[in-house]
Structures are given as structure tokens and as C-alpha cells.
Amino acid sequence: MNPTVQELVAALTLEEKAGLCSGADFWHTKAVERLGIPAIKVSDGPHGLRTQREGSTDPNDSIEAVCFPAGCAAAASFDPALTRRMGAALGREARANGVQILLGPAVNIKRSPLCGRNFEYYSEDPYLAGELAAGFINGVQSEGVGTSIKHFAGNDQETRRLSVNSRVDERTLQEIYLPAFETAVKKARPWTVMCSYNRLNGAYASENKPLLTDILRGAWGFDGFVMSDWGAVNDRVKGIAAGLELEMPGSQGVNDRRLIDAVRSGALDEAVLDRAVTRILNIVLLAADLAQRPAAFDRAAHHRLAAELAAQSGVLLRNLGALPLHRGQKVVYIGAYADQPRYQGGGSSHVNTTAVSALDAALLHDRMVQYVEGFPADRDQRDETEFLRAVTAAEAADVAVIFAGLPDSFESEGGDRRHMRLPDCQNNLIARVAAVQKNTVVVLHTGAPVECPWADDVSSVLCMYLAGEGVGEAEDALLWGDADPCGRLPETWPLRLEDTPCYLDFPGDGVTADYREGVYVGYRWYDARRMPVRWPFGHGLSYTGYVYRNAVLSADTLAEQGLVTVQVTVKNSGAMQGAEVVQLYVADTTGTPVAGGRVLQVLRGFQKIALQPGEEQVVTFTLTPRDLSHYDAALHDWYAAPGRYEIRIGHSSRDIRVTLPLHYAGTRLPPLQVDETTPLGILLADPRTAPVVQHALRDETAAMTNGGGDGLMPPEAMAQMFDALTLRNMINFGGPQAEEKLTKLLETLQDAVQ
């Protein structure tokens, strides 16, 4: 009979306990052979296995593996079932290669398009990111391999990521930057969480007790262990006390000794170390047991899956009729990415693989296409001869397809982009080709939005993001109409960098990153400012069409502890099979003031449905009070004001097809701090204090308003001035007894809000 974890912990020496809390090398935990405790192996990455080749001493010498779409592309699928299938495939590959924990998914929020690692991340929206991450984690772990969701938390830039202090207010943190982690933890129970490098509100993530213990374990119920990002530990003793169990990749015994010394000196309670070891061993023994399963995978099948996922993720941004292409047309492919596609980003997630290009796929399917390089893949350099060859070929063709994108040097882990532009050589060629060829198609290979100054001059734009090794086959199917584009944008594409929410603050001064935009990230920002964008969140065109009808709520009113269902019928009104992403947004139209500002609408549901021509399907969503809520920092909890909300269902955040009113019958009211400086407008707007103020200040109100009709001030201005008056201002008109009146009134008001 195998010993229990508790028995193992009791049998370990202090030195062995400390040793189990750090890695043995770059990719392994430590073993304790005398007690039968095995080492386990971890590996990158979130869209393909990057594990060190056996016998190699170079941690970057990786085996060949399947490269699936990066997070930016997978998110465009808007389909957690697809990320689950991708995760399951990665789990099979990991187990076949002796890997017990896969280091992913990465769910940091796309705060700015300039973040160099955006290609790994899912979305600007935490709800979408969380649902996709949960699908991925459930897929990987269904194969007996663990995951490490990362980077927890506030790691939304690469500039000075090892030390920068991300300053985020409580509401913004809880409403934007933590929910994706929360959803994944609650819905998928990842084996591990990886803490980030940065500081969050002054404390390194690796020693941030509110983050690692109070929120992650206390509020969300996480029951795995926390590991550091590679080299992210600042103070090992503080870290283990805060809830960081495993240091990776280890410090060659330096931090082990610090833990031992801290226990012996009394600075660290050995029970805290025992707790960390227990959490690690729970996962290590589970992983070792599941690793006994037979392990194999079909490389060809996984490649086909990668191509399928890439096709499901392609987003048709614009189409005036140039797509789909047809046999018999004279088509020219322009741009080095047609032959050398950019399909993944640089850094720890880089997979050793080979991709099929669009040119390869066209030849395989006997497409009659001409190819001109036009511009290089790896640099911004204009070759005049190639430039003119491309323009000439485009003018002579029926359709010109330009394969554009960002070189690796423009976006990669470790550094942020400096601008949002494509290389000049590409922008110039696109503009010139569009001037001579009305049927110009641009295919984009980027990990994040780029400025598209030529967008109104071309016929069609297809965004592939970084779509993995199957990108060429996917592009071929989408361009030639063998598949319908059904991807949707997981982020807003702004017209220009200056429009972005954190333009003035990203990436900060190198010491501090101030998240001054608050909750206004992505579409929340653009909607609040009624700002035009290039393409909105959730946008994506199709070769077919969809009609929405018969939308209905199960009830007109939502109770405080209740739920309502929303149903809508969606029909494929076109002549081609397709898949629609039905999106549900909630808008708070109660008019209740919200500290930090009210967001106009928030994504609270989405479903991707495949429909044959003429087929229709009823889509159902379920909503609870949490879906109507914002985070209230005074309550330290989620809060929905009673009143009217709108349920908006549509094709994108700015293509709403159906709007339904919903009344929320909540009885809970937010806390209200009352003192002599509280403005009357606030007190009169609150149902608890309004009657008290109206009764107590009748005489003072009359005194203040009697002069309002003498022409000195319009009634509207008088009302605004009255709204701004404080209790002290009003009572001061009461004469000698003002102080006594104020004291009694404050007592009554404070009793009313208890």
C-alpha cells in the first residue's frame, strides 16, 4: 500500500521539504528516491509542445511537435469546444513525450495592442478569455496531463516585466484582469497556476498574499499549487508564506537553504513549508499515477486538427465581392508570407515544426495562381524590382491577393511593439496594388491589431492572426470558398494607436505601469466614447447570411437569487453552410451612479452554431444577477443595482440584432458613507437617505430656492448648484442652532444606511 501524502510529508527531512519546493533543472521537479517520490516534467507551451530533446543540454533544443493556432487565433474561433479539442490533442502529445504539466494557457488581458506577447493571449474581454481557457484546460487535463494557467496577474506588457509595478485599482482588477483566471479555476480546476514576474500594487506576484492566498484559494477555491514563472521569485521565504509553492527552475540550492534557515531561526513556521510540500505532492503523485496510461498520438491527425482550427479562426474583416475566389480567374499571390507564412510568435511558446504555406496548398489543389514575392518576410526593406513586378502582375490579374503581416522582429516575448503599423514596404505595396487592381485582397498574419490605412481602398481583408502550421490549408479553403469564414474578432481593431485606452500610459515609465483607464479596456472604452473603430469586437463577415428572430426572455423580472433564460432563433439565410457566433451583451440602463464609471455593455454569453442553408436553430442563454453586476470596491463584492437592464443579442458588439428589456428586482443597496461633506445630490438619489434629507431640510431648502426665480440664475443651473451643496452648506443657513441640527441629522442619516 502506497503511503499517503501526509505520511510522506511526515517522513521528509527539512532539507528534502525545502528541496521539493524548487525545480531540479529547467524542466523537472525534484525526486526523493528513498521515499519513492518521483520527479515530474513540465513543458511549454500554450499552442504546441516545446520540450527539450532527450540527451540535449540546451533547454531550447526542442523536439518536433504540432503547432496549433496561437491564443490570438484560437480566440477568434469563439468556440470553447474547439479549444478543448486543441487542449486534448496537446495533452496526448505531452503524455506521449513524458510531460506531466503543460505550461499554459496564457490568459492575460490585451490591454494595449502594443504588448509584444499579445499573440499568446486570448482577448481584451475577460469573459471570452475565461471560457476559452476553461475549454483548453479541460481538454489537456482530460488526457491525464496538468496545466499551468498564466501569468497571474497584471502581466500585460513585456517592458520591464521582471520588475514593473502594475498599479490597478480594486474594481478594475476584479472586473477586468482576474475574471479569466477565476472562470478557469472554477470551471476547469487547473492543476497549477503560474505567478507572473511583475509587481502588482507594490508586491511581487510571487509574494503577493492577497493574490495567491486570499483571492486564488480563499475566494475561488483553488486546490492545486502555484509555481513561479521562470526566475520570478524575489524573496523565497516571503513567497512561500504568501502561497508560492514551487520555484522554477530552481536556484541551485540557494533558496532551498534560505527556507531551511528561516525554519530553523523561527522566521518561517515549518507548518507553512509542510503545507506547500503537501500541495506539490498532491499533484506530483496524481501526475505520476496518470502517466502510467498508454500514450500515443497521430501526428497526421493532429496536423489536420491544426488546419481545421485555423480555418475556424479566420476572420473575414471586409468583403466587397472579391472573395471567394473562383476557378478560371487569373489570380496572383503577392508577398513572402504566401510562401513563408508567419504562423507563430517568438519566445517560450515557439514550436519546432514546419508549416504548409498558402502557395503549397494552392498547388496541391491545382489552383492556377501566379506568385510574386513583392516584399521580404523578415524585414522592412523595399526591393524596387520586386515592388514593380508585384504591381505589374496585380494590374494584369483578375484578383491580387497580398499576404501581409508583422515580422518576428516586430512582435515577440520580451519586448513591446513601438507602433501599430505594418512595415512600410508592405503598406506602400498594398496601396499601390489597390490603385491598379479593384479586386485586391489582403490576408493578414499578425498577433495583434495593426493600423490599416488602405482598408477602404481594397476589396477584401482576411485576418488569420498567427494560425499555426495548418495556416496555408486554412487560407486556401477560406480564400477559395471551400470553407466559410466564421471567426470573430476577440479584440477591437482601432483606427490608430492614439485612439487606444492606455495610449498615454503604456508601457509606463519603466518603474510603474498605471492602469489609469480603469475598466475601460477594449470595446468598453470605444463604446463609452462613441468612438469609430476600424473593426469592432466580435466582428466577422461570412459568405452566407443570418437572420435573428423570436427573441424571448423566460421572465421579464430577475429576482435577487434567481435566473432567467434568453432564447433567440437564428437562421442561415444564405446558400452556403456556415457558422454564426451569437453574442449576448448586458447593458446597465438603471441610471444608478457607479464609482469608476458605468460600462455601456458587457459580453455575458456567446455560442457558435453551425447551420446548413435554410436551417435554423434556437440558441439559449442563462443569466444570473452576477451577469448584471459590476464590482463595487466599497462592498468588496459584485453588485447590481435594481432597475432596468437591456439584453442585447447580435452579430458583434456593434451589430446588435435584438434588444430585450429586463427588470432586476434586487433589494441590496451599496454602502454609503455619510458625513457633513456629503453632497445633497448623492443623498437625494439614495432611497435610504432621500426621505430623511427632504424632511429635515424643508426650511433650508426653501430658503435656498426662494431666490431662484429672481433672474439671477436659470432653474437648471440652480438645480445643479443645489445638487453640489453639502450637508454643512445647507445647515449653515439655519442660524445659531446649525451645529446641533447637523449632528442630529448625521446620526439619523447614518442610522438609515446601516
Feature map (PLM): residue ranges:
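Glycoside hydrolase catalytic-domain context in secreted enzymes
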Residues: 1-629, 644-649, 653
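Terminal connector regions
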Residues: 625-668
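Globin-like tetrapyrrole-binding proteins
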Residues: 748-750
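Conserved, compact domain cores that house catalytic/ligand-binding motifs in diverse enzymes
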Residues: 678-741
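Basic/polar N-terminal segments that are highly enriched at the extreme N-terminus
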Residues: 1-4, 665, 753-754
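Acyl-CoA thioester-binding alpha/beta core of soluble enzymes
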Residues: 13, 741-745
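Low-complexity, Pro/Ser/Thr- and charge-rich linker/hinge segments at domain boundaries
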Residues: 665-685
